[in-house]
Amino acid sequence: MRDVLGKSASDKAGESWEISGVEGDISMVQNGFLEGNSLQELTEIYMGDLLGDSIYQRFGVEFPLLLKFIDAADFLSVQVHPDDKLARERHNSYGKTEMWYIVESDQGQLIAGFNRELDREQYLQHLQEGKLKEILNYEKVAPGDIYFMPAGRVHAIGAGVLLAEIQQTSDVTYRIYDWDRTDNQGNPRELHTELALDAIDFSFHKNYKTDYQALENSTVNAVDSPFFTTSVIHLDKPVEKDYNLIDSFVIYMCMEGAVGIAYGKGEVETMKKGETVLIPAELKNLALIPTEASTLLEVYLK
């Protein structure tokens, strides 16, 4: 996290919450005349000008996305998230659909879904017999790989994987398996076996990785879902961006290089690898000016 992304974090830090409206972990403005204000305060003051009118009507002052970097030193727990309907019924919360963009991978892997057709009873049998690992789908990953994880898909991040995560604003997680780890007192971590049963999507897919074609100086759509739209932009020269046809804020996450964001009357905001910038919905035209070969993720809502 510190060496690759330049984060001022300890060696043991596993996550960097880049843009968050989650209570207790709300993002703060880092520069400009609004420096020191929270994202919550900005949504309350600027409403549709910041979020987009249609987004504000849907979510109010609650920021709808949470963006992170995650650096896994060991395999994280196998987990699943409920969809909106189940999360609302149980937790009065949104569900959690998310996506991962692999920044670096030291020969790492992740888990996405199952490796065969399954039903609820077969899943439970493997779980009860301690054979869950046999039915999980393991994927070797490389920088630039994208995985879309809809609510209901079991998943886990493996050791040596550094990734960017884009998700609905929700902290509801059902832990299924934690590799038989124990705490200092020898106690296993709490699992949510029963809660997870109604949340899991048992369907099998031949290909869990998102296919997209990387093109220079073009905006390539990779994920288009009801919860967020994410595109990949590879830059080696300036690119003009026009957002007049969308009614949403835009977020850039810099995966590689460094980029100037030019807007207004000559203003320029710079960002480098590991940094994240929120563009308000009222800003419809800007230019992306790379100072070296760069890669951005572009995120917004429809």
Q: Where are the regions a protein language model picked out?
A:
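Transition-metal
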Residues: 1-118, 178-206, 230
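Ligand-binding loop in jelly-roll beta-barrel domains
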Residues: 62, 70-75, 84, 105-107, ...
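His/acidic/aromatic-lined binding-pocket segments of jelly-roll/cupin-type domains
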Residues: 67-68, 76, 98-101, 138-139, ...
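Short beta-strand segments in beta-sandwich/barrel cores
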Residues: 108, 240-241, 257-262, 276
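Double-stranded beta-helix
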Residues: 112-134, 164-207, 292-302
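Short, basic/aromatic beta-hairpin or loop at an interaction surface
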Residues: 117-129, 247-260
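Short acidic-glycine-tyrosine-enriched beta hairpin
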Residues: 136-148, 263-283
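C-terminal amphipathic alpha-helical segment
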Residues: 174-246
